[in-house]
Amino acid sequence: MVLSRDRVVPSAVYLEAFENYQKQSWRNRCRILGPRGREDWSFPIVHRNGSHNGIPITELEIDWSGDWLRRFKGALETAYGSSAFFEYYYDGLRDILDSRPSRLWDLNLLCMEWLLSALGVPAELGSSISYGRCPVENVLDLRTAFHPKRENDYLACHGLGRPYFQVFSPRFGFTGGLSAVDLLFNEGPASITYLKIL
């Protein structure tokens, strides 16, 4: 992520296109807050010869067989259907999911484009041209900052976490470390203001 001159809003977001798929990472997962608490969802991937080790992230295929997509969309509707902005934004996300891109990279790219636009983040989206350190100044490298198996909320650890209203916060209190759709469905157009004052 390349930060703007004010070092607050990214002017560009780069996705790492030259890594191999990392098992048990956020690349095919998301976390939402439902009526029973945090829910972790995984998008199943196609295993080549019984494995996915060493497969470039841009070549990894999604396994669209089975019932998981219907269950995932149902979970989103249950978790956020009563949120203030669900009806305004959900169709865009549902359309991406229903398009069933064959590769995980394409799904993640479509979701990131949609999220940046919906959140009102004025940033260009691109992909890396090689693996390694970026020589550009003002780059915030977050490739290893987040992992579902580490229970550290990156924002909270850096003193940046700030609660916002969540549908189930009366039951669970504020729950950090969730997908950006949680912020979007609950805060809507105010999401960009929330992000700017982190």
Where are these regions (language model features)?
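Residues lining hydrophobic/aromatic ligand-binding pockets adjacent to catalytic sites
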Residues: 1-198
